[in-house]
Regions:
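Inter-lobe coupling/hinge region of RecA-like P-loop helicase motors
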Residues: 1-29, 36-48, 90
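Core RecA-like ATPase module of SF1/SF2 helicases and allied nucleic-acid translocases
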Residues: 3, 35-141
Length: 141
């Protein structure tokens, strides 16, 4: 372990298969595991490696959440480098924009094949954003 955590155990999961297909499976899992609401958490984040991956995930997640009845108008943000702010609820962003922010629940979503130093740092940054619940997800081969 890189560091000591308190709270719920970390959920680690790999979604094997083609990258786009396995990423979508991981996003389905996030929709299922998301704990936002009055009796749950105020903030959650999906933290990804690159802006392209974050943009794609935000688009797919927004559609899935709307279909599930989630208030994406007021409780969903895609945080990118030109964003001025983001709302309480679910934020989708990259690890380098998440640096310095904290969320009640964090889903780290990285391609399994990327074991570069930068990707390891990204996973570490994502992991240290979680206040209460951390889900470390990998997708692809």
């Amino acid at each position: 372990d890189l560091f000591e955590r308190h709270g719920a155990p970390v959920e680690e999961k790999h979604f094997p298969g083609k990258e786009s297909q396995s990423m979508e499976q991981a996003l389905d899992e996030i929709v299922k595991k998301l704990e936002l609401g009055e009796e749950q958490f105020e903030t959650a984040a999906v933290v990804l490696r690159t802006e392209n991956e974050a943009k794609k995930a935000a688009h797919i997640l927004k559609e899935k959440l709307q279909a599930a009845g989630f208030d994406t108008e007021n409780r969903f943000s895609y945080l990118h480098r030109d964003s001025a702010s983001f709302c309480k609820g679910l934020t989708v962003t990259t690890f380098y924009l998440a640096k310095g922010l904290e969320f009640d629940q964090v889903f780290s979503l990285f391609p399994k094949a990327d074991r570069s130093t930068l990707s390891r740092q990204g996973r570490y940054i994502a992991a240290t954003r979680a206040l209460h619940k951390l889900h470390m997800y990998e997708y692809g081969k």
